[in-house]
């Protein structure tokens, strides 16, 4: 027997390929079965109708770089902590995400990957965990940011083969292309279909291009913990990671558009250089998201101590940021206000672009017939009113901040 249909009518639907005024988006079970003008909606007396006049409906947001929220971090590696993060970020319109790890001893990273596997097999409530993003420990010491220096290291095949016990769960890895062993890992993992990203890197243009040849196709949190033009062989200059990403069409990238990490001109420069279709927005949120101002660790509970204050996560000396404390809806609003892009373009950077990056655009990332019933309903100011995940309506979710994990 088919599931009862649920029709959201009257909203402006941002697919994001089009904006459909006075739209109808119909869900049946966990699939979208109709998207179009309300006037074209077939009459069915059994369909439950929800009037969204004056509102917007868009695909659910997909966050490919997120560490935590509401006091929990994916490195805490428990089902309860995963659920806390996923429930919290569903409040911001995120319907699916990559659980992102941090630099730590190997057993702790493996524990997080084990929980990713468990949660994929038996999902928690809130945003769907699509897999894992390995960020660290294979980073540049000079560009490690808030990752603990005592655990930063070069790739060793004996170690990464243990990580590959979770090959099906790992969808993405960030590493510094210039460190010993990085290119070998890139060649191996890219052949397995894992997305390779350069990040936390002090690489030169020539080192970046060798990484592109080895399978790298993305750059993590543009401008952040990333090399720029320098004189590696004085007096001659050479571009760094920033210039390589801006110049090379084969590289995609991501922006932390929280209004804190990057000024508007750098956000606009990235899209002007790369084009909308090659840029995703990400939160890179840490456990302090949604929590009171105070001291919180980044990554594992023994990780780098950071201060959350006035909507920012900072290193204790306030010398740099330590991830963000925002949700995806904030990013989308900032793309419109700071980057001067359309609502449709902003939604694309949070939906279809990350879906294409993850090679799941056949089932996620847009409002189209046959795709997963993941939607976000927004008011006229683009604030989240309700999230729909796999056809289940989840209004603003309650959650218990896990303050003991500070």
Q: What is the predicted role of each segment?
A:
Residues 1-6, 13-58:
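Histidine-rich, glycine-flanked metal-binding segment
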Residues 11, 297, 356, 366-402, ...:
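C-terminal cap of metal-dependent C-N hydrolases
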Residues 54, 89, 134, 189, ...:
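Conserved, mostly hydrophobic/aromatic
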Residues 55-111:
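Metal-associated gating/positioning segment near the N- to mid-region
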Residues 87-98, 141-167, 210-252, 292-322:
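Active-site gating loops and adjacent loop-to-helix segments of metal-dependent hydrolytic enzymes
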Residues 113-135, 142-203:
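Metal-dependent enolase-superfamily TIM-barrel catalytic cores that perform enediolate-based chemistry
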Residues 164-293:
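Active-site core of metal-dependent hydrolases
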Residues 237-255, 271-283, 288-371, 375-377:
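His/Asp/Glu-enriched, well-ordered alpha-helical/loop segment
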């Amino acid at each position: 027997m088919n599931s009862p249909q649920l029709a959201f009518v009257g909203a402006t639907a941002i697919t994001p390929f089009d904006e459909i005024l006075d739209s109808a988006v119909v869900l049946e079970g966990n699939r979208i079965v109709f998207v179009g003008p309300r006037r074209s909606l077939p009459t069915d007396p059994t369909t439950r109708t929800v009037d969204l006049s004056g509102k917007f409906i868009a695909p659910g947001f997909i966050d490919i770089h997120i560490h935590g929220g509401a006091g929990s971090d994916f490195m805490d590696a428990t089902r309860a902590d995963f659920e806390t993060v996923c429930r919290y970020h569903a409040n911001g319109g995120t319907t699916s995400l990559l659980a992102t790890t941090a630099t730590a001893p190997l057993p702790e990273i493996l524990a997080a990957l084990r929980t990713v596997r468990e949660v994929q097999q038996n999902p928690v409530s809130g945003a769907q965990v699509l897999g894992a993003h390995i960020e660290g420990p294979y980073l540049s010491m000079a560009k490690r940011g808030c990752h603990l220096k005592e655990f930063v290291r070069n790739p060793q095949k004996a170690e990464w083969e243990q990580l590959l016990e979770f090959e099906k769960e790992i969808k993405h890895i960030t590493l510094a292309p210039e460190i010993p062993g990085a290119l070998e890992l890139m060649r191996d993992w890219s052949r397995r279909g894992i997305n390779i990203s350069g990040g936390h890197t002090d690489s030169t243009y020539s080192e970046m291009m060798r990484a592109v040849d080895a399978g790298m196709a993305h750059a993590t949190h543009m401008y952040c913990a990333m090399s720029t033009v320098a004189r590696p062989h004085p007096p001659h200059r050479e571009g760094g990671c920033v210039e390589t990403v801006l110049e090379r069409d084969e590289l995609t990238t991501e922006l932390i558009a929280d209004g804190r990490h990057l000024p508007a001109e750098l956000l606009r420069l990235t899209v002007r250089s790369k084009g909308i279709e090659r840029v995703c927005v990400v939160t890179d949120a840490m456990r302090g998201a949604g929590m009171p101002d105070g001291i919180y660790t980044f990554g594992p509970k023994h990780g780098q101590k950071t201060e959350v204050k006035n909507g920012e996560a900072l290193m204790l000396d306030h010398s740099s940021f330590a991830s963000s404390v925002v949700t995806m809806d904030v990013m989308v609003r900032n793309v419109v206000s700071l980057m001067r892009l359309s609502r449709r373009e902003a939604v694309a950077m949070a939906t279809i672009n990350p879906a294409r990056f993850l090679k799941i655009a056949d089932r996620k990332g847009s409002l189209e017939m046959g795709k997963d019933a993941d939607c976000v309903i927004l008011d006229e100011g683009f604030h989240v009113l309700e999230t729909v995940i796999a056809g289940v309506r989840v209004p603003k979710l309650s959650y218990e901040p896990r303050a003991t994990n500070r």
